[in-house]
Curated annotation (Swiss-Prot):
Residues 834-874 are annotated as: CTAD. Changing residue 844 to A: Decreases interaction with CREBBP. This is Endothelial PAS domain-containing protein 1. Interacts with HIF3A isoform 2. Efficient DNA binding requires dimerization with another bHLH protein. Heterodimerizes with ARNT; heterodimer binds to core DNA sequence 5'-TACGTG-3' within the hypoxia response element (HRE) of target gene promoters. Interacts with CREBBP. Interacts with EGLN1. Interacts with VHL. The modification Phosphothreonine is found at residue 844. It comes from Mus musculus (Mouse). Pfam families: bHLH_HIF1A (PF23171), HIF-1 (PF11413), HIF-1a_CTAD (PF08778), PAS (PF00989), PAS_11 (PF14598).
Length: 874
């Protein structure tokens, strides 16, 4: 039994030993095959003998794929000569990088031997590996895009070449330090490589091969040359004369530039500081430079490629720039950009202008020639110089730009008295036309112009500093004549240049109402309105028209002008559509006479005449002097805003005539009905209450506010009493009348436009409600007399008002559709205007207080004003 067991054991051991020996034999044979394969690789024996099996297989596969690529790309008839083989060894030494062949899957099937010089990793270590194992993860997507065909293989050679060219940047691991030491792969750093090449397509089977019975798909690979970008701080080779350094901010603005740019391109380093480099790029290269800038900010280094930089005096030069981002060693933040600029050519097309900076060179070469004309050292006559200058400028009109003075040039004044020209008198036989008697007309109408007639847009102003608004044009230092007579001189005396210039500057064209109205409508009147502060604490602004002296109470015979009829300028003149039968029946003669007179009045009276034959309006004064007598200042000075309204109201013709202080003629504008519809939306119109009164004294804002409160209080008391009278005399305590009065009071709100103000004080600003209240002199509303024509009223009734004539120089007219008949009583006044299509806008107390004008130079009550305010309060 034991012998059988021993025999079985020995037989099993023999089989195991035989299997082990067979395995050793197979492995030895495999090793021999691998070594034979390694020796077949185009590698040195010292390298191939130390390869493991995996490396041998990896390198062998890469070699076979490379050989297939070369065999498909290169033609069969090409035979390498010995000279070409010798030159192959010199190519790698001359190149600034290494060559790599990458398949469409990312396998590096070939790498040149000099890769270890730049990257530290050897050819054997990288060949056959995937490129994604040694590149930056952020660049993988860009690498994949460059490995594949973007637009397909194409059908033509041209389309194939355009779609297969590649130029990109990638970051790869580098084990070589700046000092030349080699570190471990785990301690490797990223180095930016500039990769340029193309994608090649080849067949899987060699040509004319019978082994490939079936059609195999096409293969593609990327053949690139990878050039590392050298850091500026590690440059050992000195820069040549065709290279200059520059430093930029992160947005490519120059912060430093080498002096060699002056002789290379023509720019001074100082004139480049602070300017962007994009200003000097050629327009066709701006897109590529923008892409290079993006790569620089993303990857830290970039090579711009060949581009054109504009020269200073025209043309451009070809450059290539290597940019590097310099990081702050403390916080590792980007600090600046260092650029090494290689000038590749001379200035090309220097006679072509590509930018505005190059236009300066157009006139610079001719400066010496032009200045020689005015050189006083020459003995050439003045006439010859003038003729030469005229011919020169006629041939080259662009030289006129150089004759204009530039900042820093000396300005030479021209002396007109140095040359005497004998010219015939141009005005010897000049005769004034009979229709334009200048001197005689001026002398005959001198009194009238001094007293009444005002030119358009002129207002007398005192030269008080602080109270006048600066005119449209600055004051001139030269003296000007005070009247047109000063422009005349005898024919024996020579004409003055100053007077001639002022004569040509005057506007001598006749102005008709249409043209003047057009000129006036072009002005922006809203910007000329008085300043109204939103809060009551703003600084006081002086009005455009300063305070004027008191006007005499005696009426003047000459017609005066004011701005109460300014609405006729801005409103369409449609008397037929607006007046209605109420006005046309009562005042046909007045309208006809007014129309006849307006055809012959000058523009100043048409614009500013209020029809007042009495005293002068406060907004007008004595006859203004023309522009020539104001020291060269512009006469575009504006009076206060006209007292107009937004909304329409009834136009009490008879009442206004009763409130006038003097006997007015029939043809005055005081009695004419309005000739414009109540649609004045472009201009802000204010009532006479807001406009303020310019009487013998100027009312302060505090006094106006106090008077408004007293007027409101008296109005409510009086209307309550009047309502009780109309309702049957019920006492205020009764429920029906008191409740009805509260409802009416809430409707009125203190500022109801349908109820007049009952103020009888002579010291308050006159307005339409004040004038209406003076008709009855304290009578209730239901006892108001019906309207009467102005002819039935006498001057005695007008004198009952007791107001100073200065306050009523300009009458205020309300514009609106006519009413059928005057109604009496409070209830009738509330219900009467309901059929009218227009109503006055409701003004709140805040609106009234905000729109109070700021008159005078004092904001506090003083002297007589304070006494009047105290008297009214008590």
């Amino acid at each position: 039994m034991t012998a059988d067991k021993e025999k079985k054991r020995s037989s099993s051991e023999l089989r195991k030993e035989k299997s082990r020996d067979a395995a050793r034999c197979r492995r030895s044979k495999e090793t021999e095959v691998f070594y034979e394969l390694a020796h077949e690789l185009p590698l040195p024996h010292s390298v191939s003998s130390h390869l493991d099996k995996a490396s041998i297989m990896r390198l062998a596969i890469s070699f076979l794929r490379t050989h297939k690529l070369l065999s498909s790309v290169c033609s069969e008839n090409e035979s390498e000569a010995e000279a070409d083989q010798q030159m192959d060894n010199l190519y790698l030494k001359a190149l600034e990088g290494f060559i790599a062949v990458v398949t469409q899957d990312g396998d590096m099937i070939f790498l040149s031997e000099n890769i270890s010089k730049f990257m530290g990793l050897t050819q054997v270590e990288l060949t056959g590996h995937s490129i994604f194992d040694f590149t930056h993860p952020c660049d993988h997507e860009e690498i994949r895009e460059n490995l594949t065909l973007k637009n397909g293989s194409g059908f033509g050679k041209k389309s194939k070449d355009v779609s297969t060219e590649r130029d990109f940047f990638m970051r790869m691991k580098c084990t070589v330090t700046n000092r030349g030491r080699t570190v471990n792969l785990k301690s490797a750093t990223w180095k930016v490589l500039h990769c340029t090449g193309q994608v090649r397509v080849y067949n899987n089977c060699p040509p004319h091969s019978s082994l490939c019975g079936s059609k195999e798909p096409l293969l593609s690979c990327l053949i690139i040359m990878c050039e590392p970008i050298q850091h500026p701080s590690h440059m050992d080779i000195p820069l040549d004369s065709k290279t200059f350094l520059s430093r930029h901010s992160m947005d490519m603005k120059f912060t430093y530039c080498d002096d060699r740019i002056l002789e290379l391109i023509g720019y001074h380093p100082e004139e480049l500081l602070g300017r962007s480099a994009y200003e000097f790029y050629h327009a066709l290269d701006s897109e590529n430079m923008t892409k290079s800038h993006q790569n620089l900010c993303t990857k830290g280094q970039v090579v711009s490629g060949q581009y054109r930089m504009l020269a200073k005096h025209g043309g451009y030069v070809w450059l290539e720039t290597q940019g590097t981002v310099i990081y702050n060693p403390r916080n590792l933040q980007p600090q600046c950009i260092m650029c090494v600029n290689y000038v590749l050519s001379e200035i090309e097309k220097n006679d072509v202008v590509f930018s505005m900076d190059q236009t300066e060179s157009l006139f610079k070469p001719h400066l010496m020639a032009m200045n020689s004309i005015f050189d006083s050292s020459d003995d050439v006559a003045v006439t010859e110089k003038s003729n030469y200058l005229f011919t020169k400028l006629k041939e080259e009109p662009e030289e006129l730009a150089q004759l204009a003075p530039t900042p820093g040039d000396a300005i030479i004044s021209l002396d007109f008295g140095s040359q005497n020209f004998d010219e015939p008198s141009a005005y010897g036989k000049a005769i004034l036309p009979p229709g334009q008697p200048w001197v005689s007309g001026l002398r005959s109408h001198s009194a009238q112009s001094e007293s009444g007639s005002l030119p358009a847009f002129t207002v007398p102003q005192a030269d008080t500093p602080g109270n006048t608004t600066p005119s449209a044009s600055s004051s001139s230092s030269c003296s000007t004549p005070s009247s047109p007579e000063d422009y005349y001189s005898s024919l024996e005396n020579p004409l003055k240049i100053e007077v001639i210039e002022k004569l040509f500057a005057m506007d001598t064209e006749p102005r008709d109402p249409g043209s003047t109205q057009t000129d006036f409508s072009e002005l922006d009147l809203e910007t000329l309105a008085p300043y109204i502060p939103m809060d009551g604490e703003d600084f006081q602004l002086s009005p455009i028209c300063p305070e004027e002296p008191l006007m005499p109470e005696s009426p003047q015979p000459t017609p005066q002008h004011c701005f109460s009829t300014m609405t006729s300028i801005f409103q369409p003149l449609t008397p037929g559509a607006t007046h209605g039968p109420f006005f046309l029946d009562k005042y046909p003669q007045q309208l006809e006479s007014r129309k006849t007179e307006s055809e012959h009045w000058p523009m100043s009276s048409i614009f500013f005449d209020a029809g007042s034959k009495g005293s002068l309006s406060p907004c007008c004064g004595q006859a203004s002097t023309p522009l020539s007598s104001m020291g060269g200042r512009s006469n575009t000075q504006w009076p206060p805003d006209p007292p107009l309204h937004f909304g329409p109201t009834k136009w009490p013709v008879g009442d206004q005539s009763a409130e006038s202080l003097g006997a007015l003629p029939v043809g005055s504008s005081q009695l004419e009905p309005p000739s414009a519809p109540p649609h004045v939306s472009m201009f802000k119109m204010r009532s006479a209450k807001d406009f303020g009164a310019r009487g013998p004294y100027m009312m302060s804002p505090a006094m106006i506010a106090l008077s408004n409160k007293l007027k409101l209080k008296r109005q409510l008391e009086y209307e309550e009493q009047a309502f009780q009278d109309t309702s049957g005399g019920d006492p205020p305590g009764t429920s029906s009348s008191h409740l009805m009065w509260k409802r009416m009071k809430s409707l009125m709100g203190g500022t109801c436009p349908l109820m007049p103000d009952k103020t009888i004080s002579a010291n308050m600003a006159p307005d339409e409600f004040t004038q209406k209240s003076m008709r009855g002199l304290g009578q209730p509303l239901r006892h108001l007399p019906p309207p009467q024509p102005p002819s039935t009223r006498s001057s005695g009734e007008n004198a009952k008002t007791g107001f100073p004539p200065q306050c009523y120089a300009s009458q205020f007219q309300d514009y609106g559709p006519p009413g059928a008949q005057k109604v009496s009583g409070v209830a009738s006044r509330l219900l009467g205007p309901s059929f009218e299509p227009y109503l006055l806008p409701e003004l709140t107390r805040y609106d009234c207080e905000v729109n109070v004008p700021v008159p005078g130079s004092s904001t506090l009550l003083q002297g007589r004003d304070l006494l009047r305010a105290l008297d009214q309060a008590t």
